[in-house]
Amino acid sequence: RGRTFNPWNKKLTPGGSSGGEAAAIASGMSPFGLGNDIGGSLRNPAYCCGIASLKPSVGRIPAVRTIEGFQDRGIAGEFYAEGPMARSVEDLKNGLLIMAGRHVDDPRSISVEFNGYVPENPKAAIVKSLPNHEIAKANVEAIEKAAKILEDKGWIIEEVDAPEVDHVYNIWLKVLNSGMLDAIPENTFQPKTEAYLQRFAEQSHNDPLTLYEALVERDRLRRV
């Protein structure tokens, strides 16, 4: 227990919520790690600590024996995904291959092969600007760099807008806050973290969307 520092600079955050795992990997304490992600808990610490991670599709890696007592995730399970963390993309891929698959204790887990159909001319959409939001120059440059790598490998790159990003966030918040905190066992977090999560949950109380409407909207957006 104790404060987790960013191994590159103690004045900077290691990110979260899987910041401890990311810091351990970046500092050489561990070659590989496992975390979970609802809204960035794998991806945020990965970019803060300079390692590799991803949020797989829900069910790709079975969610068992990770957070004690949190196997029954309720509606939070719609977003909750287990994922690997590593110092390189190659290590990340190998870890994902090892962990993926069906597990009897996770009804959302699935067995799907990784060598599925790949389009002859794969496409990727990139977003470099968001309405009413500022994106740091370094982030835009990283997106452009990734797009160039894909383009050099034969991908078709298309720059698109994301006009409903705030609406998507509100839907995510409404679904997530519909009882998620009740599913977390008592004494899982320290008091300051508990207070932060309570404030986070209160954000959705002013949203006029009902849970049913939010779920319907989520399905509509997934079809677009």
Predicted regions, residues:
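Short glycine/serine-rich loop segments
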Residues: 1-96
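Residue-level signal for inorganic ion chemistry
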Residues: 92, 150, 214
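Short helix-loop capping/hinge segments that flank enzyme active sites or metal/cofactor-binding pockets
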Residues: 121-127, 174-223
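Conserved beta-strand edge residues that scaffold enzyme active sites
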Residues: 38-39, 163-165
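A short helix-breaking turn/cap at a secondary-structure junction
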Residues: 55-145, 164
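General small-molecule cofactor/ligand-binding pocket signal
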Residues: 156-161
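Short glycine/threonine-rich loop-to-helix capping motif typified by GTGT followed
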Residues: 137-139, 168-178
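Short helix-loop-beta junction
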Residues: 143-155
